[in-house]
Amino acid sequence: MAPVYEGMASHVQVFSPHTLQSSAFCSVKKLKIEPSSNWDMTGYGSHSKVYSQSKNIPLSQPATTTVSTSLPVPNPSLPYEQTIVFPGSTGHIVVTSASSTSVTGQVLGGPHNLMRRSTVSLLDTYQKCGLKRKSEEIENTSSVQIIEEHPPMIQNNASGATVATATTSTATSKNSGSNSEGDYQLVQHEVLCSMTNTYEVLEFLGRGTFGQVVKCWKRGTNEIVAIKILKNHPSYARQGQIEVSILARLSTESADDYNFVRAYECFQHKNHTCLVFEMLEQNLYDFLKQNKFSPLPLKYIRPVLQQVATALMKLKSLGLIHADLKPENIMLVDPSRQPYRVKVIDFGSASHVSKAVCSTYLQSRYYRAPEIILGLPFCEAIDMWSLGCVIAELFLGWPLYPGASEYDQIRYISQTQGLPAEYLLSAGTKTTRFFNRDTDSPYPLWRLKTPDDHEAETGIKSKEARKYIFNCLDDMAQVNMTTDLEGSDMLVEKADRREFIDLLKKMLTIDADKRITPIETLNHPFVTMTHLLDFPHSTHVKSCFQNMEICKRRVNMYDTVNQSKTPFITHVAPSTSTNLTMTFNNQLTTVHNQAPSSTSATISLANPEVSILNYPSTLYQPSAASMAAVAQRSMPLQTGTAQICARPDPFQQALIVCPPGFQGLQASPSKHAGYSVRMENAVPIVTQAPGAQPLQIQPGLLAQQAWPSGTQQILLPPAWQQLTGVATHTSVQHATVIPETMAGTQQLADWRNTHAHGSHYNPIMQQPALLTGHVTLPAAQPLNVGVAHVMRQQPTSTTSSRKSKQHQSSVRNVSTCEVSSSQAISSPQRSKRVKENTPPRCAMVHSSPACSTSVTCGWGDVASSTTRERQRQTIVIPDTPSPTVSVITISSDTDEEEEQKHAPTSTVSKQRKNVISCVTVHDSPYSDSSSNTSPYSVQQRAGHNNANAFDTKGSLENHCTGNPRTIIVPPLKTQASEVLVECDSLVPVNTSHHSSSYKSKSSSNVTSTSGHSSGSSSGAITYRQQRPGPHFQQQQPLNLSQAQQHITTDRTGSHRRQQAYITPTMAQAPYSFPHNSPSHGTVHPHLAAAAAAAHLPTQPHLYTYTAPAALGSTGTVAHLVASQGSARHTVQHTAYPASIVHQVPVSMGPRVLPSPTIHPSQYPAQFAHQTYISASPASTVYTGYPLSPAKVNQYPYI
């Protein structure tokens, strides 16, 4: 029988594994620490570190550990089997390794070869850190016993058990009694029984605040699980109940999707609550320790960040706070087979945001948010602070703020990031512990106490534990710079570091209200890697994309149709069935068919080869977890007779266009009925006044993807008899609401109302709403949706690569053409399938701005916006017909000046506020500013090699306040036979979340470079243009009958691409827009004659209105309205067949200037006089979509 040592209040029973041949004496070091309820014992791998804080004497025993490889798991519900370490907190070490107390244990020694001896020791680096890593702040101090292994002693062969001698300590602490009480006394090979399973204890893994964790074998299977045995002490009962309830809530979600540990079951064992978890391999701290605390390259930090941010996104959507995020609680699932695949563990400190108590001690100190230190109200943002500290620690190899006390913690933060704002300090309940008011000043301000002052008041001596002391976070980019990179790889590393620091500063924003959210984090350029697309041939970039492969969704049998998970759409294959059938990528989550009847949507899971990103399937694909943080609350939205009750996927933008009439063609140019919904976290709905039939769509239709590069749309036009496909994109944008009945009646309280011509644009109304649940189709309402081919744009930087990889561009459109509410193009192949049902009604026109710069008008405060919804409106100012387009973005002057810090040095990309700068809209699909193959010489933005200059501090705030307006100003052309049309409605896009139009230098696609600083919201509307070449990219259109809309997408650090949408045509005479401005009062001079004489009856009627006097000489822009006629369309170059041309080439004219105040000579390189569309005599190409289903005509414009 193993000896029993009696402590002051409880017994410690020590067992030694019979497989060991020797015992060990141990000595106890007494260290002054701050006792707390949050000590962690993470013993794992070949080394274990044991912290004991109790009045009982820990006995040194070689702790057992598992073999690196785990047993195979035949259970299909487990995709992989790992071992887990659950960091714990306080409590004394009762047993480090236990064996049977009788000879029976010796007989069972054979199978115990799974257990190997490991060292129980204290890591030297922890001593350097002051041994305060996981301790909490308490006024009194106590002893901590640190176990050290000593040379082995003689084994007692008679008993078969090694007897260890332990020294005793008289040190006690005031709180050690409660911490030590309630722990379950473990015995190795003990059996824990639940209602359905039995588990045999294999070894002790760790101890936490609320219990201990053991490794167990699930009898009857070869599954290894981790069981957390909670204390039964009353002081922990309530928190244990909260943890169980949170785990129960999380168990309804896909743990693999959202990257948190999977809990299998909960049961009672001898009055102790036992939680059964999947086994994971190693925590991040042990991983760092194993690698000698060497800094982790950014290419490895990125997948860890993405996965943890995905978990935080889900927790935020559930209103949960983890409250103890740190490297010890981020587990590597299987480092050997799935490098950098991580999951979040330990929800023992978690709580619901509504139950967050101010002044509560939460989080480990190194990762404690300022609001916790200062005693401010807090929310889920504290987890984002912790994550920022974690990734900084991975980057540095050392904690960023390793405070030995809370005073040191806030001192470190203040020295690097500045003092917290005055209003935060004044509101904090614990501010006076660390700050004093300067009473001598007439305006008393807070100042940080000096270390001597704090020591005099508290007796706690301040220590310096930092390895790096930064004056600002930007200085972090200079440390640990690798020296083995050369050429473009070094540029990639520098660009990556800039984006990393930019994201880190947003995560470590002291004001929690301004701190970046998980969804915004997932859309930051550092995570989406848009800044790396400037270096397509860099092996370093390829490695970065390959490392992100681990974030892909993995489908396993755990996700069956019986699981209540939200399905996610990828590229949808065409279907000819009569009901709404959709095909999902099998790397997305499970299909959950909630259709109440056969007439509802049915969803099939298929097509596993479809890529869900803008990269080839061999490259990075997103985690479906990031694709769908699904809000749990349901909010049906009523609009007339239409009801939309969809489940929001906040990390994806879904566009749903559902006109009311499904029996026939009922839409008209003057009254377009339908719904246009852009879905996101706060999901506003785009409604249009006419009543519609109730529409319900499966949650899967509201799809979502993690790596934003466009928008995802589901287009359901009326009177379509079959669903042929749905184009999906990845983006995060807020939806906007545009009721047509309000046009001309309501006006936005923004800058446009100060202009004579601006107050009469179609008003825009936002109705933020949370779409939850699902939407089903009414009975007997089959739909037909054309497939929009999602182009894949491959970034290239050399002429040769552009020519050699043109064919790859069709599947690598980094920008993923956005197919939005009323934009569609029917391919020749697809039009035959849909022409009998509903003709195509709009064209998708793209161009490629080689230098989309952020330009702000010098209109002063006039350009500032007061709308909190952060809307962006696109203003189209046509003057006379022209095939060319230039873009002027009018940003609000609320943008902070510091955003100009990294402004590009290009002469084209002027980043100063209150100035007007030009944007070159580049026609060539071979748009690469580094070569001269294009007819227009385009200046390359300096930000291409500088992380796109998006790492300024004000970008987030700018997103919240800036309201840029985009004006499309084509050059002046005086062709009387051409008439233009202005869009019917303008759709603002909320930019609180970053859109993700990827920038690319592609061989056959647009180069959407954006020169705005820090995502200053220059919504540059560009038109994709296709240059004649051997490889043409086809865009397969989506047909719909919606009003023409402009959607300006934007996001911090990304590049925007906006589409021009062609409205359904009007058969009646041209009309003018009701602007009060004198220049807007009449129809364009060219309109009346040209509409009647110059156009065939089947050609589009084009409408226009005169530009304002200030921009009257700058040109016009065309938006085409199709008239009655063909169901198919092509814009053809003479030498190419109709099947390959689906884009409108637009040439750049010489007289395009964004403002009369800028001389043409300032932009000689942007507006070249030549045009390469020689096939078009008028240098313009128009595309129209007639409405008549009876006629099928094509008009190759030559």
Swiss-Prot record:
The modified positions for Phosphoserine read 16, 118, 135, 441, 634, 668, 815, 827, 934, 992, 1041, 1155, 1188
Segments carrying the region annotation (Interaction with TP53 and TP73) are: 846-941
**Where Phosphothreonine occurs, residue numbers?**
141, 252, 273, 482, 517, 566, 687
**Alphabetic keyword roster:** Apoptosis, ATP-binding, Cytoplasm, DNA damage, Host-virus interaction, Isopeptide bond, Kinase, Nucleotide-binding, Nucleus, Phosphoprotein, Serine/threonine-protein kinase, Transcription, Transcription regulation, Transferase, Ubl conjugation
Q: Name one GO cellular component term.
A: PML body
- EC class name: transferase
Q: Does the keyword Hydrolase apply?
A: no
Q: Does the keyword Glycoprotein apply?
A: no
Q: Where is this region: Interaction with POU4F1?
A: 752-897
Stretches the record annotates as Transcriptional corepression: 97-230
Which parts of the sequence are annotated with region: Interaction with UBE2I? 873-907
Residues joined by cross-link Glycyl lysine isopeptide (Lys-Gly) (interchain with G-Cter in SUMO2): 32, 953, 973
Motif Nuclear localization signal 1 (NLS1) extends across 802-805
Give positions of region: Required for localization to nuclear speckles: 873-980
Task: Locate the region Autoinhibitory domain (AID).
Answer: 984-1198
Question: At which residues is there a site annotated Cleavage?
Answer: 923-924, 984-985
Region annotation (Interaction with DAZAP2) maps to: 600-800
| UniProt modification remark | Autophosphorylation at Tyr-361 in the activation loop activates the kinase and promotes nuclear localization.
Name the reaction it catalyses: L-seryl-[protein] + ATP = O-phospho-L-seryl-[protein] + ADP + H(+); L-threonyl-[protein] + ATP = O-phospho-L-threonyl-[protein] + ADP + H(+)
Residues modified to Phosphotyrosine: 361
Q: Could you say which protein family the record assigns here?
A: Belongs to the protein kinase superfamily. CMGC Ser/Thr protein kinase family. HIPK subfamily.
What function is annotated for this protein?
Answer: Serine/threonine-protein kinase involved in transcription regulation, p53/TP53-mediated cellular apoptosis and regulation of the cell cycle. Acts as a corepressor of several transcription factors, including SMAD1 and POU4F1/Brn3a and probably NK homeodomain transcription factors. Phosphorylates PDX1, ATF1, PML, p53/TP53, CREB1, CTBP1, CBX4, RUNX1, EP300, CTNNB1, HMGA1, ZBTB4 and DAZAP2. Inhibits cell growth and promotes apoptosis through the activation of p53/TP53 both at the transcription level and at the protein level (by phosphorylation and indirect acetylation).
* Protein name according to UniProt: Homeodomain-interacting protein kinase 2
- The protein's organism comes out as Homo sapiens
The gene for this chain is HIPK2
